[in-house]
Amino acid sequence: MTNIRKTHPLIKIVNDSFIDLPTPSNISAWWNFGSLLGICLALQILTGLFLAMHYTSDTATAFSSVTHICRDVNYGWVLRYLHANGASMFFICLYLHVGRGLYYGSYLFKETWNMGVILLFAVMATAFMGYVLPWGQMSFWGATVITNLLSAIPYVGTDLVEWIWGGFSVDKATLTRFFAFHFLLPFIISALVMVHLLFLHETGSNNPTGIPSNMDMIPFHPYYTIKDILGLFTMILVLLSLVLFSPDMLGDPDNYTPANPLSTPPHIKPEWYFLFAYAILRSIPNKLGGVLALVLSILILVIIPFLHTSKQRSMTFRPLSQCLFWLLTADLLTLTWIGGQPVEHPYVIIGQLASILYFLIIIVIMPLVGLVENHLLKW
């Protein structure tokens, strides 16, 4: 008799996706982050669900409801900090996952890659709206500043901003709708993740060499399930260390002050995982130009498959491209640092140079280096 996991209509889908899935035999730990992202998403939905049971999306009570969760709800503080720091873990895994895709040429699976870019935008939108919900100073002013960027859109900008706000400023209507969307989006993300996986399983996984591995596949279970569990334990260790020892390390102290529309914080800045994009936004003195640069800093990922000039897929055997990749990584870390600094000399000029370098590496230098490497190898 054939095993039920291979015949049952529903279990068969799980089997083909996680158990009998043919996987390249040489994929490294960099391929762990997909499963970790799935676990992060599940954790965020679960902790978010329990937090939503006690949270109130009203400007008068939102801040105190979060305080109530931390003080009066059984293990509410664990839920709150797991959710807040879980978002940080989510973005760490996301950026490493995207970095892996860039390094090993996984972006040549165009459907999977583009789906991933859509997912990145969706997760960023969700995280932004979630940051507004505690209704602290940085929540309020972050929401005001970022939504106000849409007013840079010619002709319809101002109307669009007021439509999103539900009034003439960030207020009760804004908070309520942000809570509604913050609750809804993770479920949409879950559906998009399934499409992402569907596209991936059409082609099969890439591997560190970038060479097709159809002749050397092994089943996902037990070889990679055990490897994923190691990654999971490592992530849980880091997350619990954050939650239990320094839960506020990645947050902003200003968010422990209730939102006050009459008092602007000295330095308005988003959570750490948006600082690189925020630095790019601030480095352009023109409002519309800044908004375009902000969107393009992420949207640029869509054109990367079309800028691939090398005859080799992966960077494993391309030392020049490797140097550029790590230069890009250092550049992004520099932008992240600059995004958290005040707008004054020398931070402004450093941010502008780092922003120019970011776009220059991706659009110009990397494709040229790919051609140079082809020439050096006489291809």
UniProtKB/Swiss-Prot annotation:
Residues annotated to bind heme b b566: H97, H196
* Pfam families (alphabetical): Cytochrom_B_C, Cytochrome_B
Sites where the protein binds a ubiquinone:
H201
This protein's membrane topology, according to the annotation, is:
Multi-pass membrane protein
What's noted on cofactor binding? Answer: Binds 2 heme b groups non-covalently.
Nucleotide-binding as a keyword of this entry, yes or no, is no
Co-factor(s): heme b
* Keyword Cell cycle among UniProt keywords: no
- What PROSITE patterns does the database record attribute to this sequence? CYTB_CTER, CYTB_NTER
Effect of substituting V156I = In strain: Isolate Macedonia
Enumerate the SUPFAM superfamilies for this protein.
Answer: a domain/subunit of cytochrome bc1 complex (Ubiquinol-cytochrome c reductase), Transmembrane di-heme cytochromes
Q: What else is known?
A: Heme 1 (or BL or b562) is low-potential and absorbs at about 562 nm, and heme 2 (or BH or b566) is high-potential and absorbs at about 566 nm.
The UniProt entry's sequence similarity note says: Belongs to the cytochrome b family.
Quaternary structure annotation from Swiss-Prot or TrEMBL: The cytochrome bc1 complex contains 11 subunits: 3 respiratory subunits (MT-CYB, CYC1 and UQCRFS1), 2 core proteins (UQCRC1 and UQCRC2) and 6 low-molecular weight proteins (UQCRH/QCR6, UQCRB/QCR7, UQCRQ/QCR8, UQCR10/QCR9, UQCR11/QCR10 and a cleavage product of UQCRFS1). This cytochrome bc1 complex then forms a dimer.
Q: Describe the function of this protein.
A: Component of the ubiquinol-cytochrome c reductase complex (complex III or cytochrome b-c1 complex) that is part of the mitochondrial respiratory chain. The b-c1 complex mediates electron transfer from ubiquinol to cytochrome c. Contributes to the generation of a proton gradient across the mitochondrial membrane that is then used for ATP synthesis.
What is the protein's name according to its record? Answer: Cytochrome b
In its UniProt entry, the species of origin is given as: Pipistrellus kuhlii (Kuhl's pipistrelle)
Q: Which gene encodes it?
A: MT-CYB
